Protein backbone atom coordinates (compact mmCIF):
# COMPACT_ATOMS: atom_id res chain seq x y z
CA UNK A 1 0.00 0.00 0.00
CA UNK A 2 1.25 3.53 -0.65
CA UNK A 3 3.04 5.22 2.23
CA UNK A 4 0.93 8.01 3.72
CA UNK A 5 -2.30 6.70 2.16
CA UNK A 6 -5.42 6.44 4.33
CA UNK A 7 -4.96 2.65 4.44
CA UNK A 8 -1.33 3.04 5.52
CA UNK A 9 -2.18 5.58 8.20
CA UNK A 10 -4.89 3.23 9.49
CA UNK A 11 -2.37 0.38 9.83
CA UNK A 12 0.03 2.68 11.69
CA UNK A 13 -2.77 3.81 14.01
CA UNK A 14 -3.60 0.17 14.83
CA UNK A 15 0.07 -0.62 15.47
CA UNK A 16 0.35 2.45 17.71
CA UNK A 17 -2.75 1.37 19.64
CA UNK A 18 -1.29 -2.12 20.14
CA UNK A 19 2.02 -0.68 21.31
CA UNK A 20 0.10 1.50 23.77
CA UNK A 21 -1.84 -1.53 25.08
CA UNK A 22 1.41 -3.41 25.65
CA UNK A 23 3.06 -0.44 27.36
CA UNK A 24 0.04 0.02 29.61
CA UNK A 25 -0.06 -3.70 30.45
CA UNK A 26 3.62 -3.64 31.39
CA UNK A 27 3.07 -0.56 33.54
CA UNK A 28 0.02 -2.07 35.24
CA UNK A 29 1.60 -5.46 35.99
CA UNK A 30 5.12 -4.60 37.15
CA UNK A 31 4.27 -5.05 40.81
CA UNK A 32 6.54 -2.18 41.76
CA UNK A 33 9.53 -3.45 39.77
CA UNK A 34 11.55 -0.94 37.79
CA UNK A 35 10.98 -1.97 34.17
CA UNK A 36 12.59 -0.36 31.16
CA UNK A 37 10.33 -0.94 28.13
CA UNK A 38 11.85 -0.38 24.71
CA UNK A 39 9.78 -0.48 21.51
CA UNK A 40 11.60 -0.03 18.22
CA UNK A 41 11.48 -0.72 14.52
CA UNK A 42 14.52 -2.02 12.69
CA UNK A 43 14.02 0.22 9.66
CA UNK A 44 11.79 2.74 7.97
CA UNK A 45 10.35 2.60 4.46
CA UNK A 46 10.61 4.45 1.18
CA UNK A 47 8.31 4.29 -1.85
CA UNK A 48 9.12 1.88 -4.68
CA UNK A 49 9.40 4.10 -7.75
CA UNK A 50 10.64 1.40 -10.13
CA UNK A 51 11.63 -2.26 -10.17
CA UNK A 52 15.12 -3.02 -11.44
CA UNK A 53 15.51 -6.33 -13.36
CA UNK A 54 19.12 -6.92 -12.26
CA UNK A 55 19.19 -10.63 -13.08
CA UNK A 56 17.84 -9.95 -16.57
CA UNK A 57 20.43 -7.20 -17.05
CA UNK A 58 23.22 -9.66 -16.20
CA UNK A 59 21.81 -12.34 -18.53
CA UNK A 60 21.37 -9.90 -21.44
CA UNK A 61 24.96 -8.70 -20.98
CA UNK A 62 26.23 -12.30 -21.13
CA UNK A 63 27.41 -12.17 -17.50
CA UNK A 64 24.97 -14.80 -16.20
CA UNK A 65 24.16 -17.95 -18.19
CA UNK A 66 20.40 -17.95 -17.60
CA UNK A 67 17.64 -17.49 -15.04
CA UNK A 68 18.20 -20.92 -13.49
CA UNK A 69 22.02 -20.91 -13.60
CA UNK A 70 24.02 -20.78 -10.38
CA UNK A 71 27.41 -19.43 -11.46
CA UNK A 72 26.14 -15.88 -10.82
CA UNK A 73 23.27 -15.48 -8.36
CA UNK A 74 21.32 -12.33 -7.50
CA UNK A 75 19.67 -12.03 -4.08
CA UNK A 76 17.34 -9.05 -3.77
CA UNK A 77 16.91 -7.31 -0.44
CA UNK A 78 14.43 -4.75 -1.71
CA UNK A 79 16.40 -1.54 -2.24
CA UNK A 80 19.70 -3.44 -2.23
CA UNK A 81 20.94 -6.65 -3.77
CA UNK A 82 23.81 -9.08 -3.39
CA UNK A 83 25.54 -10.71 -6.32
CA UNK A 84 27.27 -14.00 -5.62
CA UNK A 85 29.83 -15.31 -8.10
CA UNK A 86 31.09 -18.90 -8.13
CA UNK A 87 34.80 -19.60 -8.53
CA UNK A 88 34.34 -20.76 -12.13
CA UNK A 89 32.80 -17.38 -13.06
CA UNK A 90 35.28 -15.07 -11.29
CA UNK A 91 36.53 -13.95 -14.70
CA UNK A 92 33.20 -12.10 -15.06
CA UNK A 93 33.79 -9.80 -12.06
CA UNK A 94 35.16 -6.95 -14.17
CA UNK A 95 32.23 -7.12 -16.58
CA UNK A 96 29.70 -7.24 -13.76
CA UNK A 97 31.30 -4.24 -12.06
CA UNK A 98 31.35 -2.30 -15.35
CA UNK A 99 27.65 -3.08 -15.91
CA UNK A 100 26.78 -1.90 -12.40
CA UNK A 101 28.83 1.29 -12.74
CA UNK A 102 27.13 2.12 -16.06
CA UNK A 103 23.61 1.61 -14.70
CA UNK A 104 21.63 4.71 -13.76
CA UNK A 105 19.63 2.52 -11.35
CA UNK A 106 22.63 1.59 -9.18
CA UNK A 107 23.85 4.01 -6.52
CA UNK A 108 26.52 2.42 -4.34
CA UNK A 109 28.64 -0.61 -5.18
CA UNK A 110 30.48 -2.46 -2.43
CA UNK A 111 33.04 -5.01 -3.64
CA UNK A 112 36.27 -6.53 -2.34
CA UNK A 113 37.43 -4.95 0.91
CA UNK A 114 34.55 -2.44 0.77
CA UNK A 115 32.16 -5.31 1.61
CA UNK A 116 33.59 -5.33 5.14
CA UNK A 117 32.54 -1.67 5.57
CA UNK A 118 28.90 -2.76 5.34
CA UNK A 119 29.28 -5.82 7.57
CA UNK A 120 30.02 -8.56 5.05
CA UNK A 121 32.85 -11.06 4.93
CA UNK A 122 35.24 -10.81 2.02
CA UNK A 123 36.16 -14.51 1.78
CA UNK A 124 32.87 -15.86 0.39
CA UNK A 125 31.23 -16.01 -3.05
CA UNK A 126 29.56 -12.65 -2.26
CA UNK A 127 31.19 -10.40 -4.86
CA UNK A 128 28.99 -7.29 -4.82
CA UNK A 129 26.51 -5.63 -2.51
CA UNK A 130 24.73 -2.77 -4.22
CA UNK A 131 22.09 -0.17 -3.46
CA UNK A 132 19.59 1.39 -5.82
CA UNK A 133 19.62 5.04 -6.83
CA UNK A 134 17.13 6.95 -4.68
CA UNK A 135 15.80 10.50 -4.44
CA UNK A 136 14.15 12.92 -2.03
CA UNK A 137 11.08 13.04 -4.26
CA UNK A 138 7.68 12.48 -2.68
CA UNK A 139 4.93 10.01 -3.49
CA UNK A 140 1.31 10.99 -4.21
CA UNK A 141 0.66 11.42 -0.46
CA UNK A 142 3.66 13.70 0.11
CA UNK A 143 5.87 11.07 1.77
CA UNK A 144 9.51 11.71 0.82
CA UNK A 145 11.87 9.02 -0.37
CA UNK A 146 11.58 7.37 -3.78
CA UNK A 147 13.74 4.34 -4.50
CA UNK A 148 14.31 1.49 -6.91
CA UNK A 149 13.72 -2.07 -5.77
CA UNK A 150 15.69 -4.93 -7.24
CA UNK A 151 13.39 -7.52 -8.78
CA UNK A 152 13.05 -10.75 -6.82
CA UNK A 153 11.82 -13.56 -9.09
CA UNK A 154 10.93 -15.63 -5.99
CA UNK A 155 8.62 -13.03 -4.49
CA UNK A 156 5.82 -10.90 -5.86
CA UNK A 157 5.60 -8.71 -2.75
CA UNK A 158 7.43 -5.67 -4.14
CA UNK A 159 5.03 -3.30 -5.87
CA UNK A 160 5.38 0.07 -7.55
CA UNK A 161 4.14 2.92 -5.28
CA UNK A 162 4.19 0.71 -2.16
CA UNK A 163 6.61 0.85 0.76
CA UNK A 164 9.81 -1.20 0.88
CA UNK A 165 13.18 -1.24 2.65
CA UNK A 166 16.56 -2.91 2.46
CA UNK A 167 18.85 -0.15 1.20
CA UNK A 168 20.62 2.93 2.45
CA UNK A 169 18.08 5.60 1.50
CA UNK A 170 17.87 8.35 4.13
CA UNK A 171 14.17 7.91 4.84
CA UNK A 172 14.33 4.16 5.36
CA UNK A 173 17.17 4.78 7.81
CA UNK A 174 14.79 6.49 10.27
CA UNK A 175 13.38 3.78 12.52
CA UNK A 176 11.39 4.76 15.59
CA UNK A 177 12.38 4.22 19.22
CA UNK A 178 10.15 4.57 22.28
CA UNK A 179 11.59 4.14 25.77
CA UNK A 180 9.52 4.08 28.96
CA UNK A 181 10.72 3.36 32.47
CA UNK A 182 12.88 4.47 35.34
CA UNK A 183 16.64 4.47 35.60
CA UNK A 184 17.04 5.99 32.18
CA UNK A 185 18.13 9.62 32.19
CA UNK A 186 16.61 12.22 29.89
CA UNK A 187 18.65 12.84 26.75
CA UNK A 188 20.67 9.65 27.17
Which residues does each PLM region occupy?
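Short, well-ordered beta-to-alpha junction loops that form the rim of enzyme active sites
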Residues: 1, 41, 131-134
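Active-site neighborhoods of enzymes that stabilize oxyanions during catalysis
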Residues: 70-188
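Short secondary-structure boundary/capping segments
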Residues: 2-8, 52-58, 143-147
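Acidic/histidine-rich catalytic neighborhood
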Residues: 25-26, 33-86
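Glycine-centered flexibility sites
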Residues: 20, 43-44, 163, 181
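A long, amphipathic alpha-helix that forms part
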Residues: 1-37, 95, 162
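Generic recognition of stable, solvent-exposed alpha-helical segments in well-folded globular domains
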Residues: 7-10, 14-17, 21, 48-49, ...
Amino acid sequence: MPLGSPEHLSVIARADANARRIADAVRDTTGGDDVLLIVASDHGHETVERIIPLETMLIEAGLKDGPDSSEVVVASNGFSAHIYVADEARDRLGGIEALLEASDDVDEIFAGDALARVGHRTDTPLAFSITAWHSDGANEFGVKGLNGAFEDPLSGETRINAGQHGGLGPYEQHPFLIVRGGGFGAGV
